[in-house]
Amino acid sequence: MYLMITAMKAQIESIPCKICGDKSSGIHYGVITCEGCKGFFRRSQQGTVSYSCPRQKSCLIDRTSRNRCQHCRLQKCLAVGMSRDAVKFGRMSKKQRDSLFAEVQKHRQQQQDDKTGDESEKNQESQAPGEAEPLTPSYALSSSGVTEIPDDLSGYVNGQTQEEGKADSAIGGFYLDIQPSPDQSGLDMDGIKLEPVCDLSSDSGLDQYCCYSNGDASPPHDDLEHLSENICKSHLETCQYLREELQPSNWQTVLQSNLEAYQKKSQEDMWQLCAVKVTEAVQYVVEFAKRIDGFMELCQNDQIVLLKAGSLEVVFVRMCRAYNSQNNTVFFDSKYAGPEVFKALGCDDLISSVFEFAKSLNSLQLSEDEIGLFSAYVLMSADRSWLQEKTRVEKLQQKIKIALQNLLQKNKRDEGILTKLVCKVSTVRMLCRRHMEKLSAFRALYPEMVHTRFPPLYKELFGSDFEQILPQEA
């Protein structure tokens, strides 16, 4: 009986999520869904949750867009049959069970037919060299930034279960069952004042990047073009909001009444709210990393190390897209907010630095493609501690740097802009360290609150072993 149930569960999980099309994890509230949509629907039934659609109540809900409109996502949940009663009673009716069983049988037959067809095609065709296989992420983003995945990061990246994903790693578990965690998309540092001087002595500012640091020749031009296109496409597909959606004219700035409400929040509540927003942004960064050619070929340990050390750095970089230079505000909690909104955090110096960094990077007026390649360069840093295959990571980072250089030249940017961007890496790392200092102080005051109310992802990202992963700054 147990084996039969296990086999049936495996068949059910082969059917994509009915809400967003992602990898499903079983039957939840009467419908086959992924963990993220299950958690989203459960939370939508708790308390007095109210969602509204900023568009025409007809938003497309799929794996990459499901987090953009809670209203349309909930309506789709209800339309496909997710039951409010199931939240209370946790059971399916006999009719629902029979219907699902029939669907599993149909899907099984379809898979067999497809397999037969695929085998015949494989005898005639082979995959083009260098062609990337489509990724099927096993994680899901909820509208509140909460993920429902009980797997560690190794399973999260590779789509394995927790049992399958248990591999030796210098940094252990990296749980992504995300709930709330402090928002660092608003954390900068004193920008230019703290920006270390970069020792890049080449006169050209660009030619120094035309070979690998180990002396190997540059990769073929076609390889660089392919990598550049892959990263730029992945960036656009994994941005939380399109740049058009972030136009300040589409959103309100925090009003005085709203400002007072934020400032009256307790320090604990404000940290938690910010945590949710950062966690939400980090999940998009993880998806971005998974789509970068070469990342999934790295060993599992190195994937985890790079994500753990670099995901917040990329969140900071992406912040420049959501910065309004007209009034020194960033997009936060569905409004454009100034530094004063974050007063309750008790981190005025850190918040000031965050805004200064966003302003500094925004002033470079980077295109989306330039932001995407720079984000990938920041993420694939070969100087992280605990990397097992530093040379492979270094070669990937160097390829990304050369691709970025080529793009900047193609866009006729000033020669010195690449040097400026490389210097920003030290700045953003210093920001992350300052955030760690603030978090440590907060955790010392409210250890129980951090333990019980902060998202697991946030706690894993910025736990006691986080600083061991970061390269030591001079």
Swiss-Prot record:
Protein name (database record): Nuclear receptor ROR-alpha B
DNA-binding region(s) from the entry: 14-89
Gene name of this polypeptide: rorab
Family annotation (Pfam families): Hormone_recep, zf-C4
SMART domains according to UniProt: HOLI (SM00430), ZnF_C4 (SM00399)
Residues in NR C4-type zinc fingers: 17-37, 53-72
Biased composition (Basic and acidic residues): 98-124
UniProt key word Transcription regulation: yes
Gene3D superfamilies: 3.30.70.1800, Erythroid Transcription Factor GATA-1, subunit A, Retinoid X Receptor
